[in-house]
UniProtKB/Swiss-Prot annotation:
It comes from Oryctolagus cuniculus (Rabbit). This is ATP synthase F(0) complex subunit a. PROSITE patterns: ATPASE_A (PS00449). GO terms for cellular component: mitochondrial inner membrane; proton-transporting ATP synthase complex. It comes from the Eukaryota. SUPFAM superfamilies: F1F0 ATP synthase subunit A. Subunit a, of the mitochondrial membrane ATP synthase complex (F(1)F(0) ATP synthase or Complex V) that produces ATP from ADP in the presence of a proton gradient across the membrane which is generated by electron transport complexes of the respiratory chain. ATP synthase complex consist of a soluble F(1) head domain - the catalytic core - and a membrane F(1) domain - the membrane proton channel. These two domains are linked by a central stalk rotating inside the F(1) region and a stationary peripheral stalk. The lineage of its organism: Eukaryota, Metazoa, Chordata, Craniata, Vertebrata. InterPro entries: ATP_synth_F0_asu (IPR000568), ATP_synth_F0_asu_AS (IPR023011), ATP_synth_F0_asu_bact/mt (IPR045083), F0_ATP_A_sf (IPR035908). GO terms for molecular function: proton channel activity; proton-transporting ATP synthase activity, rotational mechanism. Component of the ATP synthase complex composed at least of ATP5F1A/subunit alpha, ATP5F1B/subunit beta, ATP5MC1/subunit c (homooctomer), MT-ATP6/subunit a, MT-ATP8/subunit 8, ATP5ME/subunit e, ATP5MF/subunit f, ATP5MG/subunit g, ATP5MK/subunit k, ATP5MJ/subunit j, ATP5F1C/subunit gamma, ATP5F1D/subunit delta, ATP5F1E/subunit epsilon, ATP5PF/subunit F6, ATP5PB/subunit b, ATP5PD/subunit d, ATP5PO/subunit OSCP. It catalyses: H(+)(in) = H(+)(out). Belongs to the ATPase A chain family.
Amino acid sequence: MNENLFSSFATPTLMGLPIVALIIMFPTLLFPSPSRLINNRLVSTQQWLAQLILKQMMLMHSPKGRTWSLMLISLIMFIGSTNLLGLLPHSFTPTTQLSMNLGMAIPLWAGAVITGFRYKTKASLAHFLPQGTPIPLIPMLIVIETISLFIQPMALAVRLTANITAGHLLMHLIGGAALALVSISPTTALITFIILILLTILEFAVALIQAYVFTLLVSLYLHDNT
């Protein structure tokens, strides 16, 4: 029986019950909160990365936007660790599920937009009509800008889902090809296996880059509204 190509993206269950909630909570165990005065190297590295990311993202924000710093650093750490854990054999990647990514994107986007309408009402409404727009084009541009605003969370979720899913599918296909070529052409199988190793290294980079891109876009939406 041939294995379904998308079987690895099915939500895992235990005794008929979905255990995706436990999988989502698992990355939090990788970031402990030590009680010792002197941290070890792992915790020090995590803190250094968090400070570096915050410095890059919070530089452009106003004091109101910087109150979101803890949420943004938690978001990038969660998505990055989830993507990396999904590269382990026989594991499940929650970020390949569009429903989960929409569950992250919509509240974050809505929070940024609501913040903008609450504290910068005129500036937020001005985004719907660019300055210098000819009068006949005003209705059409307002509709276009409104659609572009509401499509932002969908673009956030689809981008993350598509990139992670495509990488996993490509690794699955190349891995299956390498296994099938072992008995036919060992030399070709070796070349395919080397390509698979290089692709795996690339996927590690993609996992971190997609976490950064998702968080950066949320940060930009927040910057536009604070």
